[in-house]
Amino acid sequence: MPRVKAVKKQAEALASEPTDPTPNANGNGVDENADSAAEELKVPAKGKPRARKATKTAVSAENSEEVEPQKAPTAAARGKKKQPKDTDENGQMEVVAKPKGRAKKATAEAEPEPKVDLPAGKATKPRAKKEPTPAPDEVTSSPPKGRAKAEKPTNAQAKGRKRKELPAEANGGAEEAAEPPKQRARKEAVPTLKEQAEPGTISKEKVQKAETAAKRARGTKRLADSEIAAALDEPEVDEVPPKAASKRAKKGKMVEPSPETVGDFQSVQEEVESPPKTAAAPKKRAKKTTNGETAVELEPKTKAKPTKQRAKKEGKEPAPGKKQKKSADKENGVVEEEAKPSTETKPAKGRKKAPVKAEDVEDIEEAAEESKPARGRKKAAAKAEEPDVDEESGSKTTKKAKKAETKTTVTLDKDAFALPADKEFNLKICSWNVAGLRAWLKKDGLQLIDLEEPDIFCLQETKCANDQLPEEVTRLPGYHPYWLCMPGGYAGVAIYSKIMPIHVEYGIGNEEFDDVGRMITAEYEKFYLINVYVPNSGRKLVNLEPRMRWEKLFQAYVKKLDALKPVVICGDMNVSHMPIDLENPKNNTKNAGFTQEERDKMTELLGLGFVDTFRHLYPDRKGAYTFWTYMANARARNVGWRLDYCLVSERFVPKVVEHEIRSQCLGSDHCPITIFFNI
């Protein structure tokens, strides 16, 4: 109550001074004398920020005691809200009695103002910058225009604001409007106490003033002018967080073109139309400007929140990626650490094997046996990497061994490929799956013809169309060439024969298989020669059904020919008939080449009156293979399959002299076989 009396005395003193017309002009109180207290409460909530501008400019303009009685009307000008102005003209006692809470706030605001002069070092600098903006002129001229034009729309705008920001301000009184922000003001008043406690010159009343100022600032968005000035002034204070200051300065510059109240309303409308995120930012700025130095800390917090959320969203995505990479690196690191010794030791083994190959074949088997348990000790991940290393080392060693062997074979022509003198023959048939003719030529595959000098040379899996044949194979001196490979075919077969055949037939009479090129039949005087490349069942037996269809067609075809003449079948049959015909029969029962279906079809074929010449001569020989996968250095370890055969009619078996497997001949994953006949 004593504060109310002080206000009355100050109001009486001001009534005699010429400062009274300004609040009358700003308030337009003559028209609103009959209005209710509720309308008076609504309007002040809107004009609060402008009153602050006037007070700040007045305090910065004059620090003498004469300004202090003017500060009371400016506090009343904070009552631009039309409360104190109406009280001066319409009856001081009654109006003061109604807004008791406001009168206390006004006194609280009027009392600490002389104390503000103590820390003027910090506060006066930004206020001095605000002086060039004619604050009293704006109060006298622009506010009445803005209010006269926008008193009712401001209520609508305030309602719109309250819907998005503080819904309690439009419907409630000054106390109700102050209550919801009190909770927020308490949260933000704590840093003000901490920051303002450092100079030690400001009392509790000033803290209350800051709280009330913060409350009012939250209730309105007209603080854009003060925000602009504060944003321009803040870079000086924002030396601690320079990054946030730069962002604030940019945002302040964006708001600069609206210094007037009308511009403020436009900016507020634009902000209301903008999404709530953008509207939330100016709110926090208004709070920051009222709290003074707290803006330094509060702005980075409020502004950092959206950035932090974005950073979290962005961080959450790369962070797990990094963790996954780290975890994958850890897992891969373990594998790599385990794989590195394997890769380092294995090429060492491969290097040892390469010279061993040149020396003895028996040592290769011993080294392979020694290497097996070492690999068995390693983990499966390391084993998965072994084939790649072994392929490279194997390919290198095979090339070296190939050159060495070709040189030795050239020198050992008769010794390596000739039969003993006691075995007489007059026909030599050689068969080889070259796994690509052009690659085979680059690996000096044609040397076999010079070394072996076969009478008939059968090739499978040439993978080369007739119009794409290299010149080296189009014309071999002394041979009649017969090719079958359709364009785009992946199979392809060919026959080179020194003896002119009576008739040559291409294919099996089925488009499904003849389009690829799988069989050529050459009729000679005393037999039929069939050069065949049987379809592979494929991984996971995807081609097993076509393979079964082929088997039926082939059996019918061979049976028809065998009724006319003896038949000699050479080529890649893509099956290991018996467990002795492959290194690991138990592990391959469900793999292509050793399925029960394929083996049964081979048994059926032999049951039609045909004989496997190799098993006829060497029924118990083990380790006799014609195919080795490129993986796991299988050929060096002789982990292979016998897939290439020479089958003859039973009546032609007595004419078979020898069946040789030329495992020393490189250039393909298969090796050639040579059959000697004495017809």
UniProtKB/Swiss-Prot annotation:
The record marks H670 as: Interaction with DNA substrate. It catalyses: Exonucleolytic cleavage in the 3'- to 5'-direction to yield nucleoside 5'-phosphates. The modification Phosphoserine is found at S142, S258. The record marks D644 as: Important for catalytic activity. Its cofactor is Mg(2+); Mn(2+). Belongs to the DNA repair enzymes AP/ExoA family. The gene is Rrp1. This is Recombination repair protein 1. Keywords: DNA damage, DNA repair, Hydrolase, Magnesium, Metal-binding, Nucleus, Phosphoprotein. It comes from the Eukaryota. Residues 106-116, 179-189, 203-214, 312-347 have a biased composition (Basic and acidic residues). GO terms for biological process: base-excision repair. One of its GO terms (cellular component) is nucleus. The keyword Coiled coil does not apply.
